[in-house]
Amino acid sequence: QKFLYVQRHHKLDALKRILEINNEGVIIFVRTKLLTTSLAEALENAGHSVAVLNGDIPQNQRENTVDRLKKGFINILVATDVAARGLDVERIKLVINYDFPFDKETYTHRIGRTGRAGRSGEAILFVNHREKHFLRNLENSTRNKIEELEIPNNKIINEKRMGKLISN
């Protein structure tokens, strides 16, 4: 579990940098249905395979979306907390809390989507200056220290790109 200190107006750029390094099997949690669609659109425009999961989507379409994620047809899911409970997709290696979860239960259920059944996984929490005290409260209530993560710089991103080119 890590947190990324980022101002609200830099969140999308920070997210894109993180996804340059890790973009397969990702759930990005946001607070509103509107943000699920606008963020997914921005990520699609950046070349990512993305789907949306929120309360406005009919159950059969949600199940289809989860199935596509499981099979690798999509790599990134932008979701409201409707997806937090009960979702078990082996491919999920990264959970990003794009919007801060203000209670321990929501946080626990969100990050529980990765690293299930002994698998490895990572959770990143975006925090702005107004949310720093909530971060400390979250650490206290979960009794876990959440370490700070730096936004990936160009060198790290380029090394990852080179590694992908070499492996292909």
PLM region spans:
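Conserved helicase RecA-like core
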Residues: 1-168
